[in-house]
Amino acid sequence: MEYKKILFQLFPDLENIGDWADWEENNTSLSAKLYNSKYIIKSREVEIWDDKSCIYNNIIYPKTGENLPCFGMDLMGFFDKKVIIVFDFQHPVENYLFSHPDLPKAEGTFRFFEPGNHFSENVFVRKCTMDQVNDYLDDFAAYLQAYKEMLESKKPSGFAVHSTYGDFDKYMKRLDPVSGYLSSKFGKEKAESLVNDFLFCYG
C-alpha cells in the first residue's frame, strides 16, 4: 500500500514494538501493530481486509510537553466505487483549532470531522474509487512532511500520556464508527478489546 510506504520512507526510524493482534475470522483478516521512535510514543496501526473491502487506520501520538497534534490517517475502501481517504493533524486539546499555514484549508463540512474539535482546519477528506486512491499520494506526503518537521523542531520528550491524550481518546472512542463492524466480524469481546485496549487505550 503506497500510503504506508510513504509513512515509513519519511519516518524510517519507526520501530515495531509489538504485534497486538493478528486475527482471521468470517473471511476477514485484521492486523494491529505498534511502532515508536525518538519523538513518537506510539504509532498504532490497524489493517482490516476481506474479499470486498480494506481499511487502514493509523494515529501517531507524539511524545508530550510541546503542545503538538497527533497525526491521523484513514483509508477506507468499502468496494471499488466507494473509498474514503482522510488525513489530518488531530490536536488532543478539545476546542483547539489547529491550522498549518502552508497547507490548504478544508472546504465544506464533513460528517465526523469537525475542525476545532480534535480536527484541524487542514483536514483532508476525499471520496474516490479504488482506481483513484493513489491520486492523493503527493498531498499525503506533504502533510506527513509538515508533521515530521513539527516533531523535529519541537523535539518532544514527555510521557504524560493519560493527561495529554485521555480526552482525545475518549472523544475518538465515541466517534469511532467501526465497533459494530468489528463485532459482526470478530465478536463483541474482541471488538471491545481492540477499541478499549488498543485503538483508544488512553481514554
Question: What do the predicted segments below correspond to?
Answer:
Residues 7-14, 18, 24, 140-154, ...:
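Hydrophobic, Leu/Ile/Phe/Ala-enriched alpha-helical segments that form helix-helix packing faces
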Residues 57-158, 162-163, 168-170:
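Extended, non-transmembrane interaction/recognition domains
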